[in-house]
Each structure stands twice: as C-alpha cells, then as structure tokens.
Amino acid sequence: MKNKIEFLDLGFQPLANYYLRKNQIKYKQKKYRLIVCFNKYNNLVSIKKTFPSRSMFNDQYPYRSSMSKTMKNSFKILSDQIKRKIKPKKILEIGSNDGSFLRNFNKKVTVGIEPCKNVEKITKKQKFNTIPGYWDLKLAKKIQRKYDSFDLIYSANTITHIKNLDEVFKAINLVLSKNGVLIIEDPSLLECLKRNTYDQ
C-alpha cells in the first residue's frame, strides 16, 4: 500500500448499472467503500479495495454493448483496420459481452470469453463460439488445450475490472501466438477529465 496515494473518497456506493424497482427500495442495498488511489509504481489510478467480480458480473448483468451506437461504430472501424492490417486467422475476445465486436468477423475464427451467463446466452443463440468464465490462468489453459493459440487477442473495458493483472497477462501470454497482436481498450482518467465525462 505504500505506493498508493489516496486522493478521492466517494464513500459507500451501490453497484453500478443496478437500479431498484419501487418495491425494492425498502430492502437494504449492499454498498462498497470506494476510495480512489494513484499508484506511484505503475502510474495507474484505481480503487483502493476491489470487491468480488461475481457481485457485479453475474447472470443479472444489465449492460449490452450493442445498445451503444458509439460502441458499435467504434468496433466496426477497429475491425476494418484489423482485417486490413493484421489479417488474423484466429481471434479471442476477453469480455465479449453480446458479441458486438466479434460479429464484425467470421464466426468460425472467433472465440469470446464472457462471465455473465445471461449475456453469454445471447451470443450462443447467435451461434457465436462463447465460453462462460472469468479470465484467469485456469481458463486460459482450458482454451489452450482446445484452440491452441490466437494471432489476435482483444479486450475492451474488461481488464480494469480484474484484480490480479499479473495473472491476466500470464494467461494472455499462454494463448497469444508468437507473432500475435494484443489490443486492449480501457478508460483513461486523463481523457475523462479532459472531456468532463464520467466514463470513456
């Protein structure tokens, strides 16, 4: 903790994306203490204490990337660039949500990882090759046994939600081919401040 400098205390907050119905207001909502820190070692900003992934990313997760026109357009532009410059034969997406990025490619060459079963079911119905689970070494080994390696691994707005970054990248290294490409998109606090936005 000596590398972390606390600079913003947001108090106790309920989970994001979950809105109570009128009949639920009488029940006590679980809240988490959000203290924002700057890490002098790696220059990253994060919350001081993480909470279990399953409390937010579960079978009731409400967000769908396809609901955002901006996200869909961004995925389309990026996928066109990838096809032109990288020409990947096998693609893995970590945190594939409802398949908004992967649907820009041939389903035969893509694999998605999605921990939220209610969202994963959507992509399964659309015949996407989606594996339910949280990204870690155990899942990466399972994927390696079945698919070997990938020449493109992509992840958007996912890595920031995973506590153990060392394990994240060890798992990626396990399934990324020798000359493979890794593309990660996650929010930048600096850009949020510049644009006066609460999200990317």
Model-derived regions, located:
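Short, glycine-/aromatic-enriched active-site segment of Class I SAM-dependent methyltransferases
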Residues: 184-200
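A short glycine-rich, Lys/Arg-flanked "PGG" loop and its adjoining helix->strand segment in the class I
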Residues: 166-183
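Conserved SAM-binding motif I beta-strand of class I
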Residues: 109-114, 132
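Conserved SAM-binding strand-loop segment of SAM-dependent methyltransferases
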Residues: 126-142
